[in-house]
Amino acid sequence: EFLETYRLAGLVRKYSDYIRYPIKMLMPHSKEKPKPEDAPEDYQPEYETVYEDETLNSMVPLWKKDKKDITEDEYNEFYRSKFMDYMKPLRVIHSHSEGLTASYTSMLYIPAQAPYDYYSKDYQKGLQLYASGVLIMDKCADLLPDYFGFVRGLVDSSDLSLNISREMLQHDRQLKAIAISLEKKIKSELLKMQKDDRENYEKFWEAF
C-alpha cells in the first residue's frame, strides 16, 4: 500500500510539503497518442499512460513569508484548505519569535464559528507542529491551554528535532516556552479585538 504512487505522493504532500528542496517523482499522466496519417473520419483519440517528473512539494510555506507580502485572500485560502472551514476567520495572528529558549514562527486563526464537534468529548484541540518545515504532529495539544482549544493554526521551529516522540514533547522545555508565548499572543489579540473591533469580538463571544 505505501509503495503505491499516489499514496507516496500524498505522504510527501502531507509531511514534507514545505521543506526547502524539491521532491520529485515520476507520476503517471494520460497523454493523447498522435493521430495516424491514415486515420478514418470517425477516428476516436487514443490515450496512453506516460510517466513524467513532477515536483510534489510546494517548498515555500506561507508562514515563512513576510506578513506585508501576504494578502488577506492568501491567509483565508490557506485556512480553508488546511482546516476545512469555509467561513472567513475573525483574526489571523502571524508572528516570528526569537528567544533564548526557542525560536519559532506561528500562524494562528481565530475561527468565526466553533468546530462542529467542539463541545463533544471527541473534540481534539491542538496546532500543527512543524520542525524546519516538516510536519511532525498534526494536533499538538500541549501548545494550547484548554480554554484556547478553539484556536487553529500551526507552529514551525528549527529548534525541534524531527524524530522527537510524543512522550518527549510533553517534557520538552522549548515546546513549553513556545506554548507560554502563544498563550500571551492569543490573549493580547483578543483584548485588541475587544477594544478596536467590537463587531467581530461579539461574534467571537457568541461562538465561544
What are these regions (language model features)?
Residues E1-F208:
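Long, intrinsically disordered, charge-dense linkers/tails
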